[in-house]
């Protein structure tokens, strides 16, 4: 939550057991008391036990027409996802899209994994009012994002945009630090010794050099395929992710800390 815009109000939905577990955190209770976070239960006639049940849940019209109202945006943030506070990107950059998630096809024009995704509630309502997903068919993210991409008024993020949002197994463009130093140490004016950047989010030569040449999405999604080699598969890549996005340690099993970025299976 600390990586999301401060004016966002969030809702956590879960079973009675999961809501109780989350509410044991003092930090969570503080957010609830401040009105930043709302804890609520998944309706008793719905389930998230397994991929098919999740797909049914997330393609149920009443979820969007009633339960999520008055929200216009749904950020799906599953337990194998993480948003990186160090990223130069932020969630506000993607608010104009009806769907954005880690792309299945970097050159594609629609679609992205739903495990870490941002979705338009009103556009999903339009889809579900006109069509119903058949049980045991395509996963909800494939089913919904395809139909959102077919809407004449829809705007689904393409592969290149989606790669800046979330990294799963496809790799986006590397970061570049300008060769021009932004540190003014001339001593000739009142700005001596100050840092200046051309645009918010610009990297500073001499400070951000460690980010040169690395892919740094806003967040990461592990997914059912595990930690893919294209993102995590070398010791160098893992060391950089640990420095760039230490929050990512929270989506790995704790015993991985000994090996990432350690020497066990350095490449895969």
Where are these regions (language model features)?
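Short, acidic, metal-binding catalytic loop of nucleotide-sugar glycosyltransferases
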Residues: 1-8, 28-30
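Short, conserved loop/helix-junction motifs that constitute active-site signature segments
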Residues: 2-5, 66-70, 91-95, 119
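Short, hydrophobic beta-strand segments that form beta-sheet elements in well-ordered domains
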Residues: 9-15, 99-102
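Active-site-proximal specificity loops/subdomain of glycosyltransferases
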Residues: 13-72, 86
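Generic structural signal for small/hydrophobic residues in well-ordered secondary structure
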Residues: 79-80, 120
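Conserved donor-nucleotide/metal-binding helix-loop-beta segment in metal-dependent transferases, i.e.
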Residues: 81-111
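Catalytic core and acceptor-binding pocket of nucleotide-sugar-dependent glycosyltransferases
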Residues: 109-268
């Amino acid at each position: 939550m600390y990586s999301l815009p401060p004016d966002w109000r969030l809702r956590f939905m879960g079973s009675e057991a999961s809501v109780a577990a989350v509410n044991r955190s003092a930090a969570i209770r503080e957010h609830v008391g401040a009105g930043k976070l709302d804890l609520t239960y998944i309706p008793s006639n719905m389930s998230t036990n397994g991929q098919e049940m999740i797909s049914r849940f997330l393609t149920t019209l009443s979820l969007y027409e009633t339960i999520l109202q008055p929200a216009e945006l749904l950020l799906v943030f599953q337990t194998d996802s993480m948003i990186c506070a160090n990223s130069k990107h932020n969630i506000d950059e993607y608010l104009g899209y009806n769907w954005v998630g880690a792309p299945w096809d970097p050159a594609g024009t629609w679609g992205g994994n739903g495990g870490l995704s941002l979705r338009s509630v009103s556009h999903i309502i339009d889809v579900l009012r006109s069509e119903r997903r058949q049980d045991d068919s395509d996963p909800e993210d494939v089913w919904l994002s395809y139909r959102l991409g077919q809407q004449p008024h829809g705007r689904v993020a393409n592969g290149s945009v989606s790669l800046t949002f979330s990294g799963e197994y496809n790799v986006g463009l590397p970061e570049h630090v300008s060769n021009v130093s932004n540190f003014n140490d001339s001593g000739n004016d009142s700005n001596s010794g100050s840092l200046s950047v051309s645009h918010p989010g610009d990297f500073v030569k001499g400070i951000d050099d460690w980010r040169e040449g690395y892919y740094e999405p806003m967040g990461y999604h592990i997914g059912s395929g595990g930690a893919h080699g294209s993102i995590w598969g070398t010791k160098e890549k893992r060391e950089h992710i640990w420095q760039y996005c230490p929050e990512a340690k929270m989506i790995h099993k704790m015993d991985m800390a000994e090996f990432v970025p350690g020497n066990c299976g350095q490449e895969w």
